[in-house]
Amino acid sequence: MASTRAAIRYAKAILDLANSKGVAEAVNNDMKSIASAIETNTELSTFIQNPTTTVEVKESALLEVFADVNGVTKGLFHLLFENKRFEILDAIAVEYNKLFDESNGVEVAKVTTAIPMDAALEAKVLAKVATLSDKKITIENVVDPSIIGGFILRIGDNQYNASVANRLQVLKRELSN
């Protein structure tokens, strides 16, 4: 919990700095690539979390891996190394993306399906979901085979569960009463 609060604070500060320098979108792209790299590369994640690796080694390695990032992002790296908080970099990247989207009026619609959505289906869902909100919508597809079929749509605090697993659960409750 504390690292999440710290990540939010760092993300807000970086967003403010990036906005003042006019590079918020470039930093957002950096944060997306950082979050994606840490999430998909277990070696990188383990390297960042490893307490036996010195701060200097981590800093030089990560500046080499993310050599093409914006100066504000490099400044964040340096600040995290100084404060010995580099283990929360992935959380900061995720929080920055959320704050950036929020400040630009973008809302994320999380669609959970049993199998990955193809581009055509994603376009149909996006068109339908766009009518439900006055904000710009982006789709995030989460694959969860346990829902068996159908989908679960979550936009902000609203959720619509049209999954087969949910229907079976409702049927089970009705039959047991």
UniProtKB/Swiss-Prot annotation:
Any one Gene Ontology cellular component term annotated for this protein: plasma membrane
Subunit (UniProt): F-type ATPases have 2 components, F(1) - the catalytic core - and F(0) - the membrane proton channel. F(1) has five subunits: alpha(3), beta(3), gamma(1), delta(1), epsilon(1). F(0) has three main subunits: a(1), b(2) and c(10-14). The alpha and beta chains form an alternating ring which encloses part of the gamma chain. F(1) is attached to F(0) by a central stalk formed by the gamma and epsilon chains, while a peripheral stalk is formed by the delta and b chains.
Species of the source: Flavobacterium johnsoniae (strain ATCC 17061 / DSM 2064 / JCM 8514 / BCRC 14874 / CCUG 350202 / NBRC 14942 / NCIMB 11054 / UW101) (Cytophaga johnsonae)
Keywords: ATP synthesis, Cell inner membrane, Cell membrane, CF(1), Hydrogen ion transport, Ion transport, Membrane, Transport
Molecular function terms from GO: proton-transporting ATP synthase activity, rotational mechanism
Bilayer topology: Peripheral membrane protein
Function: F(1)F(0) ATP synthase produces ATP from ADP in the presence of a proton or sodium gradient. F-type ATPases consist of two structural domains, F(1) containing the extramembraneous catalytic core and F(0) containing the membrane proton channel, linked together by a central stalk and a peripheral stalk. During catalysis, ATP synthesis in the catalytic domain of F(1) is coupled via a rotary mechanism of the central stalk subunits to proton translocation.
Gene name of this polypeptide: atpH
Family note: Belongs to the ATPase delta chain family.
Superkingdom assignment: Bacteria
Cellular location(s): Cell inner membrane
Protein name: ATP synthase subunit delta
Coiled coil: none
UniProt main location, coarse: membrane
